[in-house]
Amino acid sequence: SEPTMQKPRVLMMAAGTGGHVFPAIAVAQALQQSGAQVHWLGTLVGMENELLQHYDFSYHAINMQGLRGNGIKRLFKAPSTLLKATLAAIKIIKTNKIDIVVGFGGYVTAPGGLAAKFCKKPILIHEQNAIAGMSNNYLSKLANQVLEAFPNTFTELPSSKVMTVGNPVREAIVQVPPPKARIDVNDTSPLKLLVIGGSLGAQALNNHIAPTLKKLESMPDAKPWQVRHQCGKNNQEATQAVYSEAQLQSTQYEILPFVKDMAEAYSWADVIVCRAGAL
């Protein structure tokens, strides 16, 4: 009988924001469907902990936090934190016999990438933004292959190492019916507005959507609105206050810190207002 091919063991690295985590989930699902064994390297406190509960990936958490804007004390602790996190990642790679490491960004990718290099494992990274984040910028020098969503993100690297591939999208999002199939122009029910500020929220949207809706209400032949406003987990009270202050009459609204099921939200909406970002 023919020898059975061993399933490749892939370590995904993505943490911190939905912009890193959601595209990584899309790739992880595709890898899993093609027979790979998917492991995930995340942090102890990042949003990826909650997001990944619905998926069948082996989750490994290490203690790693960001360095930007967090004071001099953390900066002095940074080398020791990075070293400990890298050693923890090396142990994870060796214990689980990882074959390849795939990084999508977030602070966890720095120790994970260093660990992969130490263990002589191939590194592939994907950058979702037009301008690379700090971790991916550093890791691009160590990576065997660099994937970018937008052209010319990594102009300093040899072109043979970089491939422009766009952003991975989860299957559930791809299957959202097109507007023509969902929206009836003769429908007189309220227009459904979805406001998406990204996983951390967007201040401009949180401050200006409610006053804008108030102006729309005062227009002749104004249609009523039904609003779902995703404001970021630390902005719920402030955004609620902006809506209360606007004293909306015909608008129904719901303030959400985070939208877990984006496919359902997209299907529900007639109009979407979102900030520019990775996705």
Please provide the spans of the model-predicted regions.
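Hydrophobic acceptor-binding patch used for acceptor engagement in glycosyltransferases
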Residues: 101, 271-272, 279
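Conserved nucleotide-sugar phosphate-binding/catalytic loop shared by glycosyltransferases and other
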Residues: 7-15, 34-80, 231-235
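Short amphipathic alpha-helix
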Residues: 20-31
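Active-site-proximal region of nucleotide-activated glycan assembly enzymes
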Residues: 37, 47, 58, 117-179
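An aromatic- and histidine-rich active-site surface loop
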Residues: 46-50, 100-119
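Donor-nucleotide binding loops and adjacent catalytic segments primarily
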Residues: 46, 51, 55, 178-274
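An amphipathic, basic-hydrophobic alpha-helix
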Residues: 71-100
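Alpha-helix C-terminal capping/helix-to-coil transition sites in glycosyltransferase folds
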Residues: 95-97, 141-142, 264-268
